[in-house]
C-alpha cells in the first residue's frame, strides 16, 4: 500500500515537471516571435 502511494507521488511529480517544462518552452517560443 505504501509503495502504491509512493509510485503515485512520483508520477504526479514527473507530470508536474513535464508540464512546467512545456509551459516554459511555450512561453519562450511566444516571447521570441
Swiss-Prot record:
It is found in: Plastid, Cyanelle thylakoid membrane. It holds the Pfam family PetM. One of its GO terms (cellular component) is cyanelle thylakoid membrane. The chain crosses the membrane at residues 9-29. One of its GO terms (molecular function) is electron transfer activity. It is a single-pass membrane protein. Keywords: Cyanelle, Electron transport, Membrane, Photosynthesis, Plastid, Thylakoid, Transmembrane, Transmembrane helix, Transport. InterPro entries: PetM_cyt_b6/f_cplx_su7. Its main location: plastid. It comes from the Eukaryota. SUPFAM superfamilies: PetM subunit of the cytochrome b6f complex. GO terms for biological process: photosynthesis. The 4 large subunits of the cytochrome b6-f complex are cytochrome b6, subunit IV (17 kDa polypeptide, PetD), cytochrome f and the Rieske protein, while the 4 small subunits are PetG, PetL, PetM and PetN. The complex functions as a dimer. Component of the cytochrome b6-f complex, which mediates electron transfer between photosystem II (PSII) and photosystem I (PSI), cyclic electron flow around PSI, and state transitions. Belongs to the PetM family. This is Cytochrome b6-f complex subunit 7. It comes from Cyanophora paradoxa.
Amino acid at each position: 500500500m505504501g509503495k502504491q502511494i509512493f509510485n503515485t507521488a512520483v508520477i504526479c511529480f514527473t507530470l508536474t515537471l513535464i508540464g512546467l517544462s512545456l509551459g516554459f518552452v511555450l512561453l519562450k517560443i511566444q516571447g521570441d516571435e
